Every structure is written in C-alpha cells, then in structure tokens.
Amino acid sequence: MSAHFRSVALIGKYQSADVAESVFAIANHLRQRGLVVWIEQGTASSIGGAADFTVASYEEIGSRAELAVVIGGDGTMLNAARRLAEHQVPLVGVNLGRLGFLTDVARSDALQRLEEIVDGRYSEESRFMLDAEVLRSGERVFQTLALNDVVVNKGDLGRMIEFDLSIDGEFVYTQRSDGMIISTPTGSTAYALSANGPILHPGVGGIALVPLCPHALTARPVTLPDTCRIEIRLLPPHDASIHFDGQARFDARAGDCVRLGRSPLAVRLLHPEGYNYYAMLREKLHWSAVPRHN
C-alpha cells in the first residue's frame, strides 16, 4: 500500500533518558517505508547520534513536513502544537509520559499504529487554541498561543490576589482568590480538572473559567461560548504570574490586563484507527474501576 504521508518529522521530549531509543526505532522504521524523515534540531541535540538523519528546525518542519510525530508526554505535544499551529502540520503523539491525554499512541505498539496512520487509517480532529495577550497601560507587552489553558495565579505570594473579570466588555465580578484558570476543552482534563472544573468534550465550542481557591462560597466554574472575549485586570497592590500551557510565563504587575479568546489557529490532531474519546477518559481516569479490598 502506498503511503498517505510522504514526509514526517520526529519531535522528542528534551532531556529524557528513554526517548532516544523510541525516536531512532520510529525513524528507521518510517525510512524503511520510503518516507523522508527529519528529526527536530532540539531533539537531535538532546539524544545525540542523529547524524544519519536530516535535522530540521520547527520552521523547516512547518514548511516541509506532511506529518509530525511527537514522542514524549502531553507537555511535549503542547510545545510542538504551539510551534507548528500556524503551519497546520497534523500531529500524532506517542506517549512516553504519564497520563497522555494528547499522546494517545502507546510506546509498545507505536510502530504498528504509525504504520496504520501513514497508510491513511486514522481519525482527525481539530482542537482550537486560545490567543492571549497582556496589556500594560494599553500597550501589548506579551502575546502567545495556548492549547490547554491560561492560568493567572498569585505566583510567589503567600496571599490571595484580586482582579476584575469582564466578558465581551461587560463587567462580571471582582474576585479575591489564588487566581483563575481559563481552559479550552483540550485543557479541561489538565489543571482545570484538578480545580474541580468541568470536562469539556473536544467538540464543544466552550471556554471554561475555573477559580482557584476563591474567597467566596458562590464562586463556581463557568463555561462560556468560544466567541467570547475575556479580560482579567489585576487590581492594586497585587502582582501575579500568568502561565500559558504551564510552559511560557509572564510576570504581570498590578493594573495589567490579560485579554484572550479563541484563536483563528487550530491544531490538527490525528488518532489511531478505533480511537474513542470516552474509552480514553475511562482508561486515563479509571472510570468503572473495581475497588480493591485488601
């Protein structure tokens, strides 16, 4: 059977002791299939021994690769997704991490599953991203994308912060808390889940606002349409840290405004044949597990 994809880039988890074996096994297997194989330059530098393969930057991968295989955990996938979003390169994840909500191909059968995907046997879904910016005195001082979430929190402070929340230009409330998680459906099974936020199906066009330890019994998570524009303004004298997918960080000052909404960019995520969202949740979250009695 002829390959559905002709070129593939491999992106591995940096500074991981066991990623090299998986990267080389996949690279050699795909090259034997006749595919052009690139290894992302940071990955190549981290694992060493990649002289037999072409090393490529994210920009080169975005312009030349037809598929990117991300080998690591969800954090590796989040980074790759942000870096490649504007290029619309489809991504598939091989899980070397823990839960792996985004990297759903098991290492044990990665070669077989990737063989199926290369042959065109896969399902594809689009995951929307958040476009976030920080304004200071009306001027943009930071901007980035987030696939999972944007988190405004108290940072190193040993006390709560205070901020105003506005949606589509309308004031909603002033809140005192440890912060706020603004989550996409993709991020609803990450930090937001730990803060008692709702699980949002990837097909839901919604953005979840999940307070962190609010100083009010009535403060509850709220799900908004993904057409909303959200603003959080820090009130004096409180500074805060703003985290994007738990990777990029910006230290905000009192008076700064975080503005965000759905980005026009989206991530193309490929799943192996037979993938089922509910089965994935059942496995990762141990739904229907039988209690053990010692």
Swiss-Prot record:
The keyword ATP-binding applies. GO terms for cellular component: cytoplasm. It is an enzyme of class 2 (transferase). It comes from the Bacteria. NAD(+) binds at D74, G75, N148, D149, R159, R176, D178, T189, A190, Y191, A192, L193, S194, Q247. Keywords: ATP-binding, Cytoplasm, Kinase, NAD, NADP, Nucleotide-binding, Transferase. Its main location: cytoplasm. It holds the Pfam family NAD_kinase_C. Its EC number is 2.7.1.23. InterPro entries: ATP-NAD_kinase_N, ATP-NAD_kinase_PpnK-typ_C, NAD/diacylglycerol_kinase_sf, NADK. It is found in: Cytoplasm. One of its GO terms (molecular function) is NAD+ kinase activity. Gene3D superfamilies: Probable inorganic polyphosphate/atp-NAD kinase, domain 1, Probable inorganic polyphosphate/atp-NAD kinase, domain 2. The active site is at D74. It catalyses: NAD(+) + ATP = ADP + NADP(+) + H(+). GO terms for biological process: NAD metabolic process; NADP biosynthetic process. Its cofactor is a divalent metal cation. Involved in the regulation of the intracellular balance of NAD and NADP, and is a key enzyme in the biosynthesis of NADP. Catalyzes specifically the phosphorylation on 2'-hydroxyl of the adenosine moiety of NAD to yield NADP. Belongs to the NAD kinase family. This is NAD kinase.
